[in-house]
Amino acid sequence: MSFLRTHLRWGVVALLFFTALLNNLDRMVLSVLAPTLKTDLAFGDVEYSYVVSAFLAAYAIGYTFCGKVLDRVGVKLGMMGALVFWSVAGMGHAAAVGWLSLAAFRFLLGLGESFNSPGGVKAVAEWIPRRERGLCMAVFSNGNVLGSIIAPPLVTFLLLHLGWRWAFVITGGLGIVLWAVWRHVYHSPERHPRLTDEERAVIMADRTGGSRRCATESADARQRVPPGIFALLRQPKCAGFFVARLLTDPIVYFFTFWLFSYLKEARNFSDMMIAAVGWIPFLASDVGGPGGGALSDWLVRRGWRPRSARLALMLFAACMMPVAILAVLTPNAWLAIACIALILGSQSCWMANQLTLISESVPRTHVATLLALSALGGSIGGIAANLLAGRAIHAAGYVPVFCALGFCHITAFTVLVLTGRKGVSNG
């Protein structure tokens, strides 16, 4: 307790972690229930891809304005509103009577959930000193991963004992509980009633670039940046983040929505086997994010420039991705599981450092807008990849899809290096 009294910022990180966990849990309910829903609501794989795309399309639309909303109303009001919205939408899935109504509720869920990542990154930028951001961003990001781990056993339990409609109601209702926690717990550092003067001084000193080592990058980040999301897109450095996530986020979406189908169709796993091992790759992701974030923070403390430290870990993660080719070609199903685990662990390392890099690239007041821009790219890439993957799998199986995703991160890393050579211009 004494640690929390003097390190209240870690309590904020814990709140962000559980918010991210619930965010992805609500998203994963559909993936776990998909076989049952296809039978009960009488639709097939093509319609299922449309339902998935409705969510991703709403995600993309939400990213065009959620950053601006968060920058204007603040983290607390923005996240509380989003929590209520996506929780009600999640519970609404229980009223679906066909794939069209399911897609409609899925669209609303995507709009609300689009606030989570920009809001979390903005909160980290407000509360966390730069030297700690890599680990904190990884902890926040891994809330999503834990949601993926919890979803299969929890949702299956609810399905077997209460039915699929109650599974949506109960998981969605958890958001209302979390809304109450946000209302009573979260405040900005300037206004938090339980923040010690010592910790407040540490947070505020970091905002002014108190470390000489970071002076140059802090000055660059404080340049005037056009606040509009599409104005940011005209800046090469910001456009680089957009393209990078357009190329790499589809890997997460692919395994989120198609992994269970791959294991059943290509590896002949039974439903019980999928329930028993389907969470393992996501557990690996839960290790890769904090590990990559902590290591980049260690490099910063050793004297590396923050940007160089984040990029070094991202390059390492990118070099792991071609193992996807081995995953799809090996006849050993368990080796395939191990390869997929390595892919998701590396993706988590990449994402943790990418989010940290974004938070350090523009003024604190515009972090959410830039994060929303980059995430918009991820959603657009996810929509395109989902539709293309469905057609490719139908025509040629999973081999071309796995081979393509093995090289997305190397391409994205090249884009980030080329577009990041200059700072953000003044407009």
How would you label these PLM feature ranges?
Residues 105-144:
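Cytoplasmic helix-loop-helix junction between adjacent transmembrane helices
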Residues 30-31, 233-292, 351, 355:
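Extracytoplasmic gate region of multi-pass secondary transporters
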Residues 61-100:
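Conserved MFS/SLC helix-loop-helix module at the cytosolic interface between two early adjacent transmembrane helices
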Residues 42, 74, 95-101, 112, ...:
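Helix-breaking motifs and short loop linkers at transmembrane-helix boundaries and internal kinks
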Residues 77-91, 307-325, 406:
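Structural signature of the two symmetry-related core transmembrane helices
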Residues 11-45, 116, 255-260:
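Extracytoplasmic
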Residues 53-68, 279-292:
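Central cavity-lining transmembrane alpha-helices of secondary-active solute carriers
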